[in-house]
């Protein structure tokens, strides 16, 4: 839970329904969870059916009076709109409603600011926040000065972010340079992993699907597990042994969410791209969530945007311990679909076997006699492949092994 120095904010959630479906209702449910994660109390909600979002006030002038009355009745201190507002919309709403105005993007950025732990995470969050604010100073400054802080004012390390345009530009420039250094370091680490010959499997999924729980259950990594949204911002990588000799690297990544702010996608590009550079995608799904299908769609769309397509996919229908009437789900976009529970251990051995099978399909089996003078080749097999057996005979060493295709020609 994020600690709040200020009195808990009482907010009303506002959305525009442009298609007549239940999407706006479902999106507001999620917005409510985000608000709760940020430390706010939701005291009301409003959905305005419109053909399109109003360019001046988001919901249209006719709905402003009704929203004013709802704020008065609920003693609300602010509103959170379910879409990203322009500076014009934010300024007009603030002038009309005389309360704190926030949007989904500001809320998510605020949660990220409170969750950032590593130096890289803090740089990425602050950069995203400043880019968002740089184009909204006119509409944002007065609104966020209300109540002395609260949602929208937090920065990484609990610092207050400056609102001066020149200072923001200078700070963005410095952060970009720092992030470039971080990205170079990340590329170096990826290169070292590639040299090791170990395959990398990236855990991806909607926020709170249980990625960290899966990693902990398999590797005892000690990664933070939290029911709150976005409990993990920093990637963690741990080695996982699939059998006596075959290892793989398992990487946990930041969770995806509907309407993920483009400022965050840009700032967290190096972190999100762990999925792009992985050898295997492990899609963790919360099978107990009624919006499972919609969440899976968001994940695959985000992977497409990141260019992380065309890889083997294992989908884990997780949290089976919370499913009242288990269903044998099948993900048609995945190579394997497995029902799992990080809590009970259900399906984890099957998952490890699926990883093993994918790696094995990309390896070549060899039975070969090496002269004693070729011991270096056996060492290469041992470091890059899976050495099943080696037997010393008068002529040399008889080897049985599985080796990656990229080193086969050197053996």
Give, region by region, the residue ranges found by the protein language model.
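Flexible beta-alpha connector loops of hexameric P-loop NTPases
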Residues: 18-22, 53-57, 115-119, 159-160, ...
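C-terminal-of-GTPase-core extension/linker across diverse P-loop GTPases
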Residues: 1-13, 138-209, 215, 290, ...
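Short alpha-helix plus adjacent loop in nuclease-associated cores
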Residues: 106-128
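Switch I (effector-binding) loop of TRAFAC-class P-loop GTPase G-domains
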Residues: 186, 193-199, 218-247, 257, ...
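N-terminal accessory targeting/assembly segments
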Residues: 1-110
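Short, acidic/turn-prone active-site loops that include or flank metal/cofactor-
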Residues: 105-109, 229-230, 342-344
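Conserved C-terminal guanine-recognition region of P-loop GTPase G domains, centered on the G4
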Residues: 27-36, 68-73, 85-99, 245-246, ...
């Amino acid at each position: 839970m994020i600690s709040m120095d200020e009195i808990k904010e009482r907010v009303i959630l506002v959305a525009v329904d442009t298609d007549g479906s239940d999407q706006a209702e479902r999106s507001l449910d999620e917005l409510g969870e985000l608000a709760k994660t940020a430390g706010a109390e939701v005291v009301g909600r409003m959905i305005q059916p419109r053909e399109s979002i109003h360019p001046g006030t988001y919901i249209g002038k006719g709905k402003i009076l009704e929203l004013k009355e709802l704020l008065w009745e609920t003693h609300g201190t602010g509103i959170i709109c379910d879409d990203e507002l322009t500076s014009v919309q934010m300024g007009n709403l603030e002038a009309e409603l005389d309360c704190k105005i926030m949007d989904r993007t500001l809320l998510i950025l605020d949660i990220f600011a409170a969750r950032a732990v590593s130096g890289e995470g803090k740089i990425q969050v602050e950069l995203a926040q400043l880019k968002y604010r740089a184009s909204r100073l006119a509409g944002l400054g007065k609104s966020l000065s209300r109540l002395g802080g609260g949602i929208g004012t937090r920065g990484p390390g609990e610092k207050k972010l400056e609102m001066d345009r020149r200072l923001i530009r200078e700070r963005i420039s410095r952060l970009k340079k720092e992030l470039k250094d971080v990205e170079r370091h990340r590329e170096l680490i990826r290169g070292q992993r590639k040299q090791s010959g170990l395959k990398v499997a990236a855990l991806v999924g909607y926020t709170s699907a249980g990625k960290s729980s899966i990693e902990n259950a398999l590797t005892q990594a000690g990664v933070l597990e939290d029911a709150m949204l976005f409990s993990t911002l920093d990637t963690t990588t741990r080695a996982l042994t699939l059998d006596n000799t075959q290892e793989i690297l398992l990487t946990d990544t930041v969770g995806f969410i509907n309407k993920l702010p483009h400022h965050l996608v840009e700032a967290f590009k190096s972190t999100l791209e762990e999925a792009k550079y992985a050898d295997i995608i492990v899609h963790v799904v919360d099978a107990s969530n009624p919006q499972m299908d919609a969440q899976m769609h968001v994940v695959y769309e985000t992977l497409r945007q990141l260019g992380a397509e065309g890889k083997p996919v294992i989908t884990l229908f997780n949290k089976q311990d919370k499913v009242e009437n288990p269903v044998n789900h099948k993900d048609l976009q995945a190579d394997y679909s497995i029902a799992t529970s990080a809590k009970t251990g259900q399906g984890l051995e099957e998952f490890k076997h699926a990883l093993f099978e994918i790696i094995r399909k990309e390896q070549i089996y060899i039975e070969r006699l090496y002269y004693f003078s070729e011991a270096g080749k056996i060492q290469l097999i041992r470091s890059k492949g899976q050495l099943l057996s080696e037997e010393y005979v008068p002529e040399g060493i008889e080897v049985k092994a599985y080796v990656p295709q990229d080193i086969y020609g050197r053996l």
